[in-house]
Swiss-Prot record:
Keyword Ligase appears in the UniProt entry: yes
A cellular component term, taken from the record's GO annotations: glutamyl-tRNA(Gln) amidotransferase complex
Catalyses which reaction(s): L-glutamyl-tRNA(Gln) + L-glutamine + ATP + H2O = L-glutaminyl-tRNA(Gln) + L-glutamate + ADP + phosphate + H(+)
Coiled-coil ranges per UniProt: none
Gene3D superfamilies per the UniProt record, alphabetical: Amidase signature (AS) domain (3.90.1300.10)
Gene from which this protein is expressed: gatA
Active site: K74, S149, S173
Protein name per its UniProtKB record: Glutamyl-tRNA(Gln) amidotransferase subunit A
Amino acid sequence: MHTKTLKELSALLHSKQISATELAQLFLDRIAQSDLNAFLHVDPALTLKEAALADQRLASGDTTVLTGIPIAHKDIFVTRDWRSTAGSKMLENYVSPFDATVVEQFKQAGMVHLGKLNCDEFAMGSSNENSYFGAVKNPWDKAAIPGGSSGGSAAAIAARLTPASTATDTGGSIRQPAALCGVTGIKPTYGSVSRFGMIAFASSLDQGGPIAKTAEDCGLLLNAMTGFDPRDSTSIERDKEDFTRDLNQPLQGLKIGLPREYFGAGLAADVEQAVRAALKEYEKLGATLVDISLPKTELSIPTYYVIAPAEASSNLSRFDGVRYGYRAKDYTDLSDMYRKTRAEGFGEEVKRRILVGAYVLSHGYYDAYYLQAQKIRRLIAQDFQQAFTQCDVIMGPVCPTVAWDLGDKADDPIANYLADIFTLSTSLAGLPGMSIPCGFGQGEKNSKRPVGLQIIGNYFAEAKLLNVAHQYQQATDWHLRQPAE
């Protein structure tokens, strides 16, 4: 049962072959037996209460395709009645008085909430080792990282602890863990999914999206997640669309752009081999490969690591111990309380980024760093628009290597940042991008570690990306592979 797709589970629920309560209990049992640290907060009583409501809806016929199906939320989305920690000591015991819009949308669809998923603190990280509550283990090899910041979301899908999960992507945090855990994830166009109730890291980059087993599953989840929200000032007003409408379109005549910058030095041989094999499969499906250039790719890391920390330093200034969250125990005056609360409440990586952000926004450095980074960001977006005059979608690796061992890069933040080289540009441009499993590379002691293929589209081309991914998944079985229990 735990290996079935959302469509298969929906058919079983609607034909009364299984109840929402039975399905929820099945996944709760799997979560209880897991040692991956993917979940931060599980409350079986709350889950089973929601499952009972879903069963009532199924009995009355007031349903959607998602009614009764379990889902778990990245602990960046606030949830009423559940702790919302953002993986930080600062919010260790925080319970939100309201649900994030995304959580609300899935409740309205009748989905059943299984629990909150582990992530890097305030979504800052590429390995899920920055969580105050401990690292998440990769289900394919427990010595390896799952990727970040949505490591819990990807690991939980790979280990079949939930059939659906929410995640967020600021610079690659949906695509990279999906790739390293061998599952499917999509970051939609910036502004497509409401950020209301999504704990902010970098507001001009943060975007919610789903992680699941298949492209079709992601499309069904995206149908519920997207839509205009007046409570989010960056939400885009567009008609609702069915992202699964074009899944079965043939790929004959599709032009796939291959950026030469994505296949150069630094790309591991086993990753390149898996990606090239996937591209050959696309040629068999009728697609044509086109050589393109994204010349500003190498500037994406310095650009991102100026803009994102600048926005984070502003967003995280609200966590000061006054209104909610952690407060230092011993202090002499208000300034001392601010200082100690933030020093004790934030982890090392978060403090590092706040310092960088405050520096690049400070008098005398704003023009030299922040303003320059925004100019480069615009040029990166222009590179993509130029590329899309030559091709329909862009493909390449998600990450230069397979998942590395836990602790390998823990003391080297720059090495972690470099792992995002292929995902940052898409985020800076606000484009949709996804990762699908396309093979395995070599880990330590000959372990198999997944490789992801990145597919990037033009603005609002999610249906096209899902079609391109689905056709590949119909021809291959990488997305069906799962780690040993």
